[in-house]
Amino acid sequence: GEVIEMGRIAIEAKLFNDIVRKLPNSEIFIETTPDYNTIIRCEKSKFVIPSKSGEDFTELPQIEKEKSIELSQFSLKEIIRQTIFSISDNENNKLMTGELFEVKDGVLQVVSLDGHRISLRNLALKGNASNVSVVVPGKTLNDLSKIITGGVDDMVTVYFTDRHILFEFENTIVVSRLLEGEYFKIVQMLSMDHKIKVRVNNRELFDCIDRASILMR
């Protein structure tokens, strides 16, 4: 894109996203008026939407980039996909609406649970990784998975503080507050003293469950 004149404006995110999604695949021109209206033009389409001064927009918190890990966008997207389904939507227990991100001895462990299911995913990290343990809101991870490309060679750097988590990739920065509190002791929940243990082909198991689920509708 080309910046003709520098400036700042605050636009309602959902409205702006809905407009851009409906526009044709062509050049988009965005300009603002002195009374903070934003004009969006694309081919024969024109939208005029109310906005606010960019000075009123909340600044991103200053994140100290001391504790961090790096992994591929593919790995992060897969981790979220394999764990996000077992977070809870019950706001009465905030910790269950998030996922535990714990880094220890060079291994990232991501855990989610909703009181009925537990999902756990481990990933060996390359290079030096800071030991951390934080709970990330599920909504943040769900939104993040929609905007990362998932490329194997595209990297994401994740920074941790006591209150925030920051994801940095390409030209994008995503910052989120963390959920407060101590996460559940997963090791105590996962007893390894199994009387019966089976090993099955995951594709065949998925197909069986998929067929059986027809009768549950």
Where are these regions (language model features)?
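Structural preference for solvent-exposed beta-strand-turn elements
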Residues: 1-217
